[in-house]
Amino acid sequence: MTTAIAAPRRTSARAASSTNLNRQSRPLATASRLPQSRLLHIVAPSLKVPDAAAASVFSAVRTRGPIARDAVAQLTQLSIATVNRQVTALLDAGVLRERADLAVSGAIGRPRVPVEVNHEPYLTLGIHIGARTTSIVATDLFGRTLDVVETPTPSGSQSAALATLASSARRYLSRWHRRRPLWVGVAVGGVVDSATGYLDHPRLGWVDAPVGPVLAEALGLPVSVASHVDAMAGAELLLGAPRSAPEAAGAPARTSLYVYARETVGYALSIDGRVHSPASGPGTIAGLPAQSELLGGSGQLESTVSDEAVLNAARRLRIIPAEGPSSTLAAVLRAARQGNDKAEELLADRARVLGEAVALLRDLLNPDDLVLGGQAFTEYPEGLPVVEDAVARRSVLGHRDIRLTAFGNRVQEASAGSVSLGGLYADPIGAMRRAQTRRSAAV
């Protein structure tokens, strides 16, 4: 599938840097907002491990199904009566189905008939809006990617860019004739007001952009909008390796630090199965001090380790041509793997700077788990030992294992998928009701 979106607008490095330093202290604007009626179908993202009864039952079936009701009760530590009620409600909502063909031989009564997720009729739509590239993702109820298209993030005026995004998403959904879309999740940089779906994105020049309302109006579906690094941390919680309910219930509260680096840098903190999302938007690490003679930059982290910084340095060092089809980050990575000493040294220095920043965050927050995501880490895993060494040398705390994201180079699509599925996983019955009501009103 292909979707045509215009090439992204570029802001000057000086303007982007200046705006980035100030964006956290300035509240989102409130002028010229859409009518309140347009905000009724914006739902704050649910980036947490579900804990309500119906959500716990659905999670058990999603991760362990086909499964009998008594096994669900053991996994969730809910009473069999509660499980029976929730399974009946989930069957009525259409998100579960019975598998009579798998019933235990000789068993009598419907409660012994296994159930599984009824995933074929549905999908959710995820949109990851990056500084340069936008990904549109179709995800099933298991959290598996059905399809993804990547296109340049639209340029032009803010209103024109949003109209282009909405039109592309609508055309994309129109191709899914056998699956009904339930929800839209948007993962995007900048400062996000998750309650209204508005955001500021300095790199794109968006101010008080009604991303959520525009998509809700165009698609006729509930929409959730989240900071993209929060969404990536949410994907680790919702779509990563599951923990059983008894294990989770008996374990102490844990914290997880997620650090992201690609064209931008960011972090998110998960506390006891929930991504910490301040109402004023995520904090920024773009301005952390960073020094590299090879990479250059302004002495701040983002301008030193971004993809653009690596490309500029590689051109200056004549690792790649100044322009043309070979003047790409992929060419830098290829040169390093083919034994180009300058390329290896450049990427190692990027890994060192990133490791020192991770050490600073680790010492400040002291998380139980430390996860690295984004192509700065995943596209060059050869640099991970350098990151680990820099963390060990710079951190004043004891050793802590570091792991790469479970989603590798697919972290952008996973983040969008987690936002589109979070509401359904947290309240599957309510989500199905909301999606049906919104869809009916739009017809």
Describe these PLM feature segments.
Residues 127, 141, 183-187, 191-303, ...:
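Phosphate-binding/catalytic loop of phosphoryl-transfer enzymes
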Residues 2-102, 106-148, 154-166, 170-174, ...:
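ATP-binding/phosphotransfer module of carbohydrate and carboxylate kinases, centering on a glycine-rich
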